[in-house]
Amino acid sequence: MTQKTLLNDTHRALGAKMVDFGGWDMPIHYGSQLDEHHLVRRESGVFDVSHMTVVDLRGDQVRPFLRRLLANSVDKLKVPGKALYSCMLNPRGGVIDDLIVYYLGDDFFRMVVNASTREKDLAWLREQAAPFGVSVEQRPDLAILAVQGPQARAIVIGLARESEREALTKLGRFAALQVQSDDGVELFVARTGYTGEDGFEILLPQDAVVAFWNRLLAAGVKPAGLGARDTLRLEAGMNLYGQDMDEEISPYEAALAWTVSLDEGRDFIGRDALEAQKAAGTARQMIGLVMDEKGVLRHGQAVTTAGGQGEILSGTFSPTLAKGIAFARVPAGELGEVTVDIRGRQVPVRVVKFPFVREGQAQPGVLADA
């Protein structure tokens, strides 16, 4: 049975086109995916991401548990409220899921994981947490709104209690703060996002989410759907689980080496496999592609390099760049001239570093010919 967030009727009243997204009835757009994309890049937009999974982890051994569970190191989290992006891996080094974890106390961490992997993730977390005596509590009572764009933070701060606005203004990136709205709603506000823009992701009680959504719209934020969320995250060089990586792909093959922390000698799940892969060299690499010809790069298209064949993972037309962009996984080594098979024609593409766009601007080399 299709699941719905509490904002489902609200989305429909706003004229949203609804689609099935991993078993959830979610808005893909509210009239124009293109307009919503540009609004987030230039002003502000709000996404209902209440389908995501919030998990609270508690216990005296919660930090040792996370040191074992995650490829990135929670030892980097020294100040309460700070957040970390990481993958949790299987023993083969494949990605079970990517997630954000928040350090909220010596015996309390909060994690946000994907919606499509919920049951698998919860089962894995509980299995791994048991020897540490750590409790794993899913929080279906919390909704999540992502308010993103250059104007997003100022608008949200304006809805907070006056006494807490200064602290929210000073909140650093990848950090969270528990505050109240000016009408008394508890808000867990994190300066994180999945768009490449500044903004907040807000966890709040389900019974308050419709009213808070309406307050955001009244303050000038426009609703944005999952279509714009996908083009924004791809421009921002952010992976999508299940499309860009999965349990058969290691972080090294998914351009996520920066999320692997081997230095401090932790015995985390998947470490042995990653060390072996690092020593032998990975067979595949994930690269960014830009197409200067008109057209769209799409998932599954064949990519030819000097080293052999690969394929496009995530591809789209970039509204900000007005060009086709993509992630592709191809054989490791020299790439040479790279082409993509589009309806039987080998179309030349350029290999570029991603992100393609950062805070509304094309990154160096993305627009110019190599």
UniProtKB/Swiss-Prot annotation:
This is Aminomethyltransferase. One of its GO terms (molecular function) is aminomethyltransferase activity. It comes from Stenotrophomonas maltophilia (strain K279a). Its EC number is 2.1.2.10. InterPro entries: GCS_T, GCS_T_bac, GCST_C, GCV_T_N, GcvT/YgfZ/DmdA, GcvT/YgfZ_C, TrmE/GcvT_dom1. The glycine cleavage system catalyzes the degradation of glycine. The gene is gcvT. Transmembrane segments: none annotated. It is an enzyme of class 2 (transferase).
